[in-house]
Amino acid sequence: MESSRCRAFLAAAECGSLTKAADRLNYTASGVSQLISAMESDFGFLLLKRTTRGVVLTAEGEKMLPAVRAFLSQENRMHELAANINGLDIGLINIAAYSSIATHWLPKVVAAFKKKYPKITINLMEGVRQEVLQWMAEGRADIGFTSGGDDIDKDWIPLADDEMIAILPRNHPLASAESFPLERCRHEDLIMPAMGKDEDVMTMLKKYGIEPNVVYSTNESFSAWALVENGLGISLTNKLLVHGWTCDVAMVPVSPPEKITLGMILPSVKHASPAVKRFMKYAIKELKQE
């Protein structure tokens, strides 16, 4: 299997467009199309359906996509191992991370890492918890930074605990209180970020048998807090996410006190590429000091 064909197929599948795939790979659109057509000819079935809006995966393409990702990942790892044997530090690391971690933790880690390994390329994907886990499951990310949980079926390295807090309007009766009782979420107007399914918040409320009164949902936490600022409800989040953020709201610890554990996910620490192992060690060293 030719890797150039696989890369063309993967880029087209992820971009949904031959033109965008060509831009990513620095090819022409016709060149990408020819590579994919050759791959389809070898396999004996279509991988992509061409439409007026771009390209979409066929049922067969959906089945082949994970295998193609795995093939390219192993090829990258092979090149990294060869370079490592020759004393060269090269490689590619795909990182998926929480917004709070991508904003407040990773810049320092990446800066320190790149000083020593300037030839290792880092690709950072930012998303909510379910997106991070999905990208890990699909093989799109080599390392995931998110909160822990029973649903993690990969190698998990805890790094730090983070307090859960309530985001309240300034005129809220408990804006100056020492804590915000989670029980109030049964009747308070709750604004839920993370596409309306913040897994950290939902897990916390489920622990106490609380069915929240969700009145608004947003994709981004910052959008949820802007709604809070305008008196449209309250929100819940982890403290790291609001670090350095300025908005006219009150931030109050929840009661009973709750925290989440933030850390790293890897498909396998043992079988990780040399570049990924190096980054993992840097992350542990830098973030354990937080």
Give the role of each language-model region.
Residues 11-27:
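Short helix-boundary/capping micro-motifs
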Residues 42-43, 64-86:
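Alpha-helical linker/hinge and terminal dimerization helices associated
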Residues 128-133, 137-140, 147, 196-252:
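Hydrophobic hinge/microswitch elements
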Residues 40-57:
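A short LG(V/I)-centered, amphipathic sequence patch enriched
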Residues 90-152, 218:
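Central regulatory/effector-binding core of bacterial HTH transcription factors
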Residues 87, 153-164, 168-190, 274:
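Flexible hinge/capping segments at coil-to-helix
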Residues 174, 188-208, 272-280, 290:
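Secondary-structure junction motif
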Residues 153-158, 162-163, 177, 223-271:
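Beta-alpha-beta core module
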